[in-house]
């Protein structure tokens, strides 16, 4: 059962009921709280574009609690974050794994955060394919290309040499918030909301 809380707001014109995500969007907060697929990516991209059009000078906060997901869907979010004018601040709540960690590190420099008990995990892309040998070869080349592209971007966003990224993403690599800060995935560990 998917229950989305409703918030009642008192205004000079009376009461207004919002679902919680719409109310947070009013404060330029976007929640990525699920595996990343095309539907989730379209929703996040739409919210980013809407907020950028509404006020191109004001930061957007993207809260991430995601196990990761589709590379192409995640890259749609990543490209939009880079494309729009407002800075996108990223905040890990719970877990940012795989593509979730990639998006966390892609936030505006100096504005990438995690809460103290967050967990961040990086690894190489996963994929599976079946079919004729030629199809398998094409798919293998594509996933190696994607791995190299993701590693290069992660290297740029963390300041880690590409060789370190390649080694550290060879297997699931779990980090505490503090370790993610040392690694360069985030800039600060937050304990209170007013620290941002």
Curated annotation (Swiss-Prot):
Entry protein name: ATP-dependent Clp protease proteolytic subunit
Domain of life: Bacteria
Main location: cytoplasm
Function, in words: Cleaves peptides in various proteins in a process that requires ATP hydrolysis. Has a chymotrypsin-like activity. Plays a major role in the degradation of misfolded proteins.
Xref: HAMAP family: ClpP
Coiled coil: none
Catalytic EC class: hydrolase
Compartment(s) of residence: Cytoplasm
Reactions accelerated catalytically: Hydrolysis of proteins to small peptides in the presence of ATP and magnesium. alpha-casein is the usual test substrate. In the absence of ATP, only oligopeptides shorter than five residues are hydrolyzed (such as succinyl-Leu-Tyr-|-NHMec, and Leu-Tyr-Leu-|-Tyr-Trp, in which cleavage of the -Tyr-|-Leu- and -Tyr-|-Trp bonds also occurs)
GO MF annotation, one: ATP-dependent peptidase activity
Oligomeric and partner information: Fourteen ClpP subunits assemble into 2 heptameric rings which stack back to back to give a disk-like structure with a central cavity, resembling the structure of eukaryotic proteasomes.
Active-site residues annotated for this sequence: 98 (nucleophile), 123
Family: Belongs to the peptidase S14 family.
CC terms in the record's Gene Ontology section: cytoplasm; endopeptidase Clp complex
Disulfide links within the chain: none
InterPro entries: ClpP, ClpP/crotonase-like_dom_sf, ClpP/TepA, ClpP_His_AS, ClpP_Ser_AS
Keywords noted in UniProt: Cytoplasm, Hydrolase, Protease, Serine protease
EC numbers, comma separated: 3.4.21.92
GO BP, one annotated term: protein quality control for misfolded or incompletely synthesized proteins
Species annotation: Anoxybacillus flavithermus (strain DSM 21510 / WK1)
Alphabetized Pfam families for the sequence: CLP_protease (PF00574)
């Amino acid at each position: 059962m998917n229950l989305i809380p409703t918030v009642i707001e008192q205004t000079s014109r009376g009461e207004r009921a919002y679902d919680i995500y719409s109310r947070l969007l009013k404060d330029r907060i976007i929640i990525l709280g699920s595996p990343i697929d095309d539907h989730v990516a379209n929703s996040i991209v739409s919210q980013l574009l809407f907020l950028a059009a509404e006020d191109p000078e004001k930061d957007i906060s993207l809260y991430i609690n995601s196990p990761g997901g589709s590379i192409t869907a995640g890259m749609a979010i990543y490209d939009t974050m880079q494309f729009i004018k407002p800075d996108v601040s990223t905040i890990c709540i719970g877990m940012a794994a795989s593509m979730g960690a990639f998006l966390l590190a892609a936030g505006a420099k100096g504005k990438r955060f995690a809460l103290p008990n967050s967990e961040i995990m990086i690894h190489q892309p996963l994929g599976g394919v079946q079919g004729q040998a030629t199809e398998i070869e094409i798919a293998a080349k594509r996933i190696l290309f994607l791995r190299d592209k993701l590693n290069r971007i992660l290297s740029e966003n963390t300041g880690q040499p590409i060789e370190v990224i390649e080694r550290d993403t060879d297997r699931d690599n779990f980090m505490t918030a503090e370790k993610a800060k040392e690694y360069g995935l985030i800039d600060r560990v937050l304990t209170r909301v007013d620290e941002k």
